[in-house]
């Protein structure tokens, strides 16, 4: 079973790390590096060492000195995917996280209501879990959550 999980994890990492990039220079009519003269190379190196001014700005996706939020040049900046993971994968992950959080909140609500019906108070829960002594961290977290829920239930419900 561990081997199967390991194979799945390696496959997932391989899938996520695969990238495909296409250079815009390959399809453009700009001169290639073999066509540059010494004067062009000198100009380029001077531009690279300029610290201030407009020449220091880098436009990685186009050669236009336009606002990067506008997509009226041929680079279509707004439509480009820039994350490590595609947006479909991140949407699936966020849906799974939200579903898990909702399920967990419902389960805690039901458990706390059951505990209250059985007559459990924060004081009796603290005694039973030995809060203040050598209690485990998870017990302290349950106690804190139940106490907050119990106080909220009794103040909001008006009972």
Swiss-Prot record:
**What range does the record give for the signal peptide?**
1-18
The answer to whether keyword Signal applies is yes
Looking at the UniProt record for this protein, which Gene Ontology cellular component terms does it annotate, in alphabetical order?
extracellular region; host cell endomembrane system; host cell plasma membrane; membrane
Location within or outside the cell: Secreted; Host cell membrane; Host endomembrane system
Regions that span the bilayer: none
- Residues forming the motif RxLR-dEER are 58-82
Which residue stretches belong to region RABA-binding domain?
109-159
Signal: present as a keyword of the record? Answer: yes
In which domain of life is the source organism classified?
A: Eukaryota
Keyword line: Host cell membrane, Host membrane, Membrane, Secreted, Signal, Virulence
Q: What does this protein do?
A: Effector protein that contributes to pathogen virulence. Targets members of the RABA GTPases subfamily to inhibit vesicular secretion, leading to an accumulation of secretory proteins in the endoplasmic reticulum.
| Similarity annotation | Belongs to the RxLR effector family.
Comment text on domains: The RxLR-dEER motif acts to carry the protein into the host cell cytoplasm through binding to cell surface phosphatidylinositol-3-phosphate. The C-terminal part (residues 105 to 155) is required for the binding to RABA GTPasesproteins, causes redirection of the truncated effector to the cytoplasm, and leads tio the loss of the ability to inhibit the host secretory pathway.
User: How does the annotation summarize its subunit structure?
Assistant: Interacts with potato RABA GTPases including RABA1a, RABA2a and RABA4a.
UniProt protein name: RxLR effector protein 24
Give the organism, scientific name. Phytophthora infestans (strain T30-4) (Potato late blight agent)
């Amino acid at each position: 079973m561990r081997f199967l999980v390991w194979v799945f994890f390696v496959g997932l990492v391989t899938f996520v790390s695969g990238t495909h990039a296409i250079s815009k220079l390959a399809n453009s009519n700009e001169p290639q590096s073999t066509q540059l003269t010494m004067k062009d190379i000198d100009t380029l190196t001077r531009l690279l060492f300029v610290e201030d001014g407009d020449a220091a700005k880098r436009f990685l996706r186009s050669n236009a000195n336009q606002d990067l939020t506008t997509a009226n040049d041929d680079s279509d900046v707004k439509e480009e995917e820039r994350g490590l993971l595609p947006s479909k994968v991140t949407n699936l992950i966020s849906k799974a996280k939200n579903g898990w959080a909702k399920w967990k909140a419902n389960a805690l609500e039901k458990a706390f209501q059951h505990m209250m019906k059985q007559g459990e108070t924060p004081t009796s829960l603290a005694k039973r879990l030995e809060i203040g002594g050598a209690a485990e961290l998870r017990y302290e977290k349950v106690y804190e959550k139940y106490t907050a829920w119990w106080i909220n239930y009794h103040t909001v419900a008006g009972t």
